[in-house]
Amino acid sequence: MQSTLKNSKNIVSKILSNGGIAILPTDTIYSLSCITSNTNSLKKILKIKGRDAAQGMPILVPSIDYFNIYAQNIDNKIKKIIKTFMPGPLTLILNKKPDVSNLISGPNNTIALRIPDNSDLIDIMNKIKSGITGTSANLSGKIHSLDNYKIIKDLGTKVDIFVFGNYKVKNKKPSTILDVTSDKIKIIREGAIKKADIDNINF
């Protein structure tokens, strides 16, 4: 257990690079994270959560450049959305590249990506040169929590490190999810970013 992400960047980077599992604060809720290239780590996260692999897992990336590693057909409209709201609490569902693991891809060969508004987390991803899983740190079917002790009770013994976040607002919302796999933008989940914010983009 570590006190803050800022003071734990080196150890978190080492743990993730070595295939470990971490619970990390983001700009929204806690994430259950590992590097995306380690199949064993991905399987372990699915087992910890009790999550069906067919659901996929959202991926956090440090910059817009990483979108091209995981996704395809990223046109100017999608780039405009990314540049408008990221880093920030918006997740985009995109068409995945063929070589992306099925353990992190969603239905219909999709992938969910976002850039978190957390400079320490971005530093870690840049250091390890990888995106990380951003699935919520809770058991599948349970509501996400910002209560450190509840998370420790449910998941604390199953991960390699848990870094506390300075969450002052206890009702912090998860990211908004947009499906941009077709010409029509679909709001899958309205979270921290509202529908009106999306509608106000000038394409």
Region locations from a protein language model:
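Active-site-adjacent structural elements in enzyme catalytic cores
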Residues: M1-F203
